[in-house]
Amino acid sequence: MMGSSQHGHMAAIGYDLYCRMLEDTVKLIKGEIEQEPIETTVDIKMDAYIPSSYIEDEIQKIEVYKKIAAIENMDDYTEIKEELEDRYSSIPEAVYNLMDIAYIKSLAKILLIEEIKENQKEIRFKFQKGFKNVNKVYRVLLSKYKDNVVLYFGETPFFAVRINTIKREEMLNFYKELLKELIENSRKK
């Protein structure tokens, strides 16, 4: 049974996401998980949306937004890409950007990055408070980017990569490759 307040929340975010959030909260209370799952925010200066000219029906559009938001790996990405091409024809760049950003979020969660924020000069990756593998990650960054990376070792560590040498159309691929490389190297002993 749900009260009107809970039903309103469920309607706003969708049944599947609501159930997952509820399940995670119960596990956290029972002590089955140590901390709340990280929710990564991505602030990248890029058009990332589903144009009405691509999907006109608002209900279908919301369903596609939910599917894109649920991307957790490359298999999910490929599955959604194929579904969109089958149902709606070729995918506009803004939708590809949206899918890429969702995939970037999934990679960032693995590294416990809670925020990715871009400005005109750099992109900043902020780790969750108390992140433990910071030395491994920073070692990789220094070996590859030397003068183009700034590292901060405080309680909430972050790194910033200067982006003035990266072309705008290559940015999302740069983020994906950087995060995949950091994940791979952080798993090495």
Question: Which sequence ranges carry the predicted segments?
Answer:
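Accessory helical-bundle/CTD segments and flexible terminal tails appended to RecA-like ATPase motors
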Residues: 1-189
